[in-house]
A protein has these predicted regions:
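Cyclophilin-like peptidyl-prolyl cis-trans isomerases
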Residues: 1-153
Length: 153
């Protein structure tokens, strides 16, 4: 019984991560949470592994957030998919999916990373993971910085 519990726990603790490399140098890694946002993570991974995000810019940079992934680079591009609101908090380093005015509909391309705690986003946006390394790189992102590559492992 204990052995089975340990085996199940280990199997569920295998997490995917995404390492985002910037064209100007530097990278950061996000531990993805498919256990909390399965379809959102699957969509992000599919886009990342297809090369969709390569060359896309960070079009929004504020003191608390950086946002990128927009195919138009304006903050208006990207399709729609259902939200997967969850109980993961939007603390410093949290990664989430952008959305418009309808809380039930996510943007399927644009994503963001918090540079500071943003508790007002809790239960309002889909959280898909947490930065585990390179938060200093996230904090240094400027408008127009481009994604070189995203590696999922």
């Amino acid at each position: 019984m204990v052995e089975g519990h340990i085996r199940r726990r280990c199997a569920t603790s295998d997490q995917q991560s995404a390492t985002i490399e910037l064209e100007r140098g530097g990278s950061f890694t996000i531990a993805l949470r498919p256990d909390k946002a399965a379809k959102t993570v699957a969509n992000f991974v599919a886009k990342a592994t297809s090369g969709f995000y390569e060359g896309k810019t960070f079009h929004r940079v504020e003191d608390w957030v950086v946002q990128g992934g927009d195919p138009e680079g304006t903050g208006r591009g990207g399709g729609k998919m259902p939200s997967e609101l969850n109980d993961l908090p939007f603390t410093k380093g949290a990664a989430g999916i952008a959305r418009g005015p309808d809380i039930k509909v996510n943007n399927e391309a644009q994503w963001f990373v918090c540079k500071a705690d943003a508790s007002w986003l809790n239960n309002q946006y889909t959280n898909l993971g947490q930065v585990t390394s390179g938060q200093d790189v996230v904090n240094g992102i400027r408008i127009g910085d481009k994604i070189k590559k995203i590696t999922v492992g």
